[in-house]
């Protein structure tokens, strides 16, 4: 591995740095965007059961808010459960926007890495080409220099794509996951509002 890094030259280091950041972000988002963490199945029914038993007590609100993003949304609704339907819905929407923003955390960075990695690889390619052509004039010059320039160009191009392709795949996956989870939370919040106001059984 170290021999590859040496052959790729100094332009490879920004790509290595970007790959480490991308890997860390991918692992963090895989862990944080799990269904069981964001919007557990059956949470609304459990919250409504607790509401019927204890009412909208501060303990219930605090307990619900600690159950992840969906819990925060439902807690906002419970805090206004005795208010008119539009007020309760507005409170849920306000918190919902904040929760949706939190779910998208780090995705901009991951998307930027996916877009920039090929450009960093292209930069390494240009550096390698400069080394190749810069070593041409003198007759009988060291043949190792052009070979090193070729390796710099090819390794950086390849590594740029290696970083960019998985980053883009996971970026698209996480965007779709966030949209799906946001829709799920919206449906659960609507269910809470309708059940709390007797509009649904």
Language model regions located:
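Hydrophobic membrane-targeting segments
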Residues: 1-44
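Cytoplasmic-entry segments and transmembrane alpha-helices of multi-pass inner-membrane transporters
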Residues: 108-113, 144-157
